Regions:
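Cytosolic juxtamembrane amphipathic/interface segments immediately preceding
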Residues: 7-19, 153-157, 238-245, 313-316
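N-terminal signal-anchor module of multipass membrane proteins
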Residues: 2-51, 114-120
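Alpha-helical transmembrane segments and their immediate interhelical/interface regions
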Residues: 120-152, 284-306
């Protein structure tokens, strides 16, 4: 089937980095590592300085102007003395709020201390891994939905999104590493039970055990489907016939349904739960739109780069118009979801 459209040279075409590009990539990796180390050093050296200086300035201000402290206390007592006794409901509301958010009014786990430099570094790693996961999942959905729709135009470029979702096993390793420092990132873990009424109502879902189990299931199925679709795709090109196509069609149809459920829950677990007090009923769709827009942008850049390097000469302007249209369409769709929130 595919062999009638592609020459044997095109079917076995493989991209290889030139020495110049390889040196650039290694150089950028080295610069990235250096910047990470510099950022960690600066974050470490800057921990607590802002809070301490603020406290010292406040103490000096009160020492130099003791009347300020007295007047402030008098105003506080006037504002909450008779009024608070006259309105018991208001007093009970304040008391309940203080109990829900800790004695300091900012939550038991994050009221007194800001994020440490270690937390900043781990959070940067966490967000970077999330970014590449969204691109890989957008590429995987792109392949699956076009297989279900029996679209023929994407055959010329499908090796690129297949390479993009090849990142998923590495992303899974990063996700497993993230399990080790969940208690430094997620507020619903940091705040002890009983100190935040709203978070307590969500602990049946937001708990470390459920989070880890769902994540393992999601990544396991995603990686399995990605490997199966990739293997069937190469067999279809080399062996021809409809057997591998029909197998990939069935797998893709089931995956599209699983993707809609799993990716929405993944977005809630890994992104939305970072702000457990915030509500959104369309966050799964919003994340999906962003994934597809990012994946299409990455696909466009890679295809144009490969064509300039002399690869994929069979990709014509019609193909370019199609995936550029996808990029524009999902960018508009993402913007609409963003405004809707």
């Amino acid at each position: 089937m595919a062999s009638s459209h592609f020459t044997p040279e095109q079917l076995t075409e493989r991209f290889e980095l030139s020495s110049r590009i390889r040196n650039i990539v290694y150089g950028l990796v080295g610069v990235g590592v250096i910047l990470v180390l510099i950022g960690a050093f600066l974050a470490q050296s800057g921990d607590g300085h802002h809070d301490d200086s603020h406290g010292e300035e406040h103490a000096e201000l009160i020492t130099e102007n003791p009347t300020i402290h007295t007047v402030a206390n008098d105003q506080h007592e006037d504002g909450h003395g008779e009024d608070s006794h006259a309105d018991e409901d208001h007093g009970h509301a304040d008391s309940a709020h203080s109990e829900a958010h800790g004695d300091d009014g900012h939550g038991g786990g994050h009221g007194h201390h800001g994020p440490t430099w270690v937390t900043r570094v781990l959070t940067g790693f966490y967000m970077s891994n999330l970014y590449f996961i969204t691109i890989a999942m957008g590429a995987l959905f792109f392949i699956a939905v076009h297989r279900v729709g029996n679209a023929g135009w994407q055959t010329a470029i499908r090796r690129v999104p297949e390479a993009m979702f090849g990142w998923l096993p590495f992303a899974a390793v990063g996700a497993l590493a993230s399990f080790l420092f969940m208690d430094q990132i997620f507020e619903w873990i940091i705040i002890p039970e009983g100190q935040d009424a709203l978070i307590d109502t969500k602990r049946a879902y937001l708990n470390p055990t459920g989070f880890i189990i769902r994540s393992i299931i999601f990544f396991g199925v995603w990686i399995l489907v990605a490997r199966m679709l990739r293997r069937l795709s190469t067999r279809e090109d080399t062996l021809g016939g409809l057997q591998n196509f029909e197998k990939s069609l069935g797998i893709s149809a089931g995956f599209v349904v699983f993707f809609a459920i799993s990716y929405s829950l993944f977005a809630i677990d890994w992104i939305k739960s970072l702000e457990p007090h915030w509500f959104s009923t369309i966050f799964g769709v919003y994340t999906f739109a962003g994934s597809m827009a990012s994946a299409m942008a990455t696909l466009t850049i890679l295809v144009y780069f490969l064509r300039r390097q002399g690869y994929m000469k069979y990709v014509n302007d019609s193909h370019a118009q199609d995936f550029n249209t996808y990029m524009l369409g999902f960018s508009i769709f993402w913007a609409y979801m963003w405004v809707s929130q």
